Amino acid sequence: STSPFYPLFAALDVNAKMHEGQSGQRLWADCVRVGIEARKLLMKTCKYIKPFVPAQIDGKSWGDYPTDEIAQNLRFFEFEPTAKWHNFEGYGEHQYFVDPCKFLLTTPGIDAETGNYADFGVPATILANFLRENAIVPEKCDLNSILFLMTPAEDTAKMEHLITQIKRFEEFLDADAPLADVLPSIY
């Protein structure tokens, strides 16, 4: 087009300036820390929905490490070829890592160690629709995972609200609530 869209150019210029130098690094470092704290809170609060990170590092719970240590060390996000928490195969040491700015959660239903279906499961699409009914929109979901993209706009309050809603969803699971109560808009 010969007519540029000036609001878009202005937004790009502002974004570039915000991320210039140390300020951009600080914005994203804070985002990573918020994501780590959210994973820790989810581990403490919820029993069915889990963050997609190793449960333990060197025999110690992932969530028991200091946030800054986790943020500064990629081993907390590493796919180790022999690890069973993800059960992925066919890659080398230090080849793949979980992106700390992708808040990826798993729902029960597939045993990660064997790849077999578990006796109890919750399709992530049900959780996604529950969250949408409560004004939280996930980026995407599949059978047993749901993804939220972290940006510097996320803060502790937003993540705590998300986890509170996930905890509410788990309470519906424990109560074996009818789907009409969990997702009233479909009825």
Where on the chain are the PLM-derived regions?
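PLP-dependent aminotransferase class I/II
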Residues: 2-16
